[in-house]
Amino acid sequence: PGVTKVTIDWGEMTADERSAVMTRARWNAKEQASDTQVPLNARVLAIASGKGGVGKSSVTVNLAAAIAEQGNIVGVLDADIWGFSIPRMLNMPDRLEAQRVEGSDKPRIIPNERKVGSGLLKVVSTGMLVEDEGTALMWRGLMLTKAVEQFLNDVQWGELDYLLIDMPPGTGDVQMGLARMLPRTDLVIVTTPAVSAQKVAIRAADMARRSFLRVAGVIENMSTFTCEHGSMYELFGNGGGQALATQIGSPLLGNIPIEAAVAHGSDTGEPIVLSKVGAAAEAFAAIAQRIISETVSMQDMVGCSARNEKVVQVSVSQRR
């Protein structure tokens, strides 16, 4: 006789169970990813946004400078292949060069370097490959992914404490390629107070979730403007950053106010955070310190990683 009755018991996973599944997925992605030239001990942060014009590149260079100033070696990868701006924002226009290095069977791209405080910035960008910054790169999607892959695999990064990646806006080829090639990346999502920007930025968070990437937090840029008389204005609305952070379950890392000095610093290649003058500089420094503190805490937990992996495996197997 055939089957006469089938009973299916089902239920919704708890938050802890969903977290365990996501953790396991991240472990699997890391185990299956190919090796890159990015040191395993370096914390990787991709500065992302759902749309352009929210100040993502400005956030990248200021956080990189603030973290380096504390004595860290910070890599900056300009993955905004079409819209590169990092060389100007850091006043590093020199062309990249390739050299033979010991232990490699092919030449490696050598990052351009800049001392910051007691630390060091190591920077690569397609803007350091073209004749001048006005040259358009008319590349299709596959070429964009290959460029990022080359920056990860063929750059002699050497010693790094952090790698900050300035992502292009949106959720396209570069984002998907990075998730595949460097799955240990944490995302920092930049938005503005405007509800419209927040609704677009949620797509970056959704991409991270579907790619099993962790969102380290949200930064609200262009938060408020204070005039010379001390009155504060919310030119782009309010609450977008906190609303996004709450919606995706990640912390709001900080709010960056609108100051002309931020734009001036980007134009002249001197990140405002290094001036230590103004509320924007203080906000960038505070966010950088928060990232450093979290990284130290994460490193303290490395010794427990094997035990945590076993716990995750047991939890996932019990759901099967």
Name every feature range the model reports, one short phrase each:
Residues 1-49, 95, 288, 295, ...:
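Extreme N-terminal, non-catalytic leader segments
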Residues 67-133, 138, 145, 152:
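Phosphate-binding loop that captures ATP/GTP phosphates
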Residues 268-280:
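C-terminal boundary of histidine-terminating zinc-finger modules
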Residues 37-40, 59, 63, 81-82, ...:
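Helical mechanochemical/support elements of P-loop NTPase systems and associated helical scaffolds
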Residues 154-157, 161-268:
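Conserved catalytic-core segment of NTP-binding enzymes
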Residues 41, 52, 78, 86, ...:
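Residue-level signature of catalytic and energy-coupling elements of molecular machines
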Residues 43-81, 201, 205:
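Walker A/P-loop phosphate-binding motif and the immediately C-terminal alpha-helix
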Residues 234-260, 277-282, 286-320:
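C-terminal accessory "lid"/substrate-recognition subdomains
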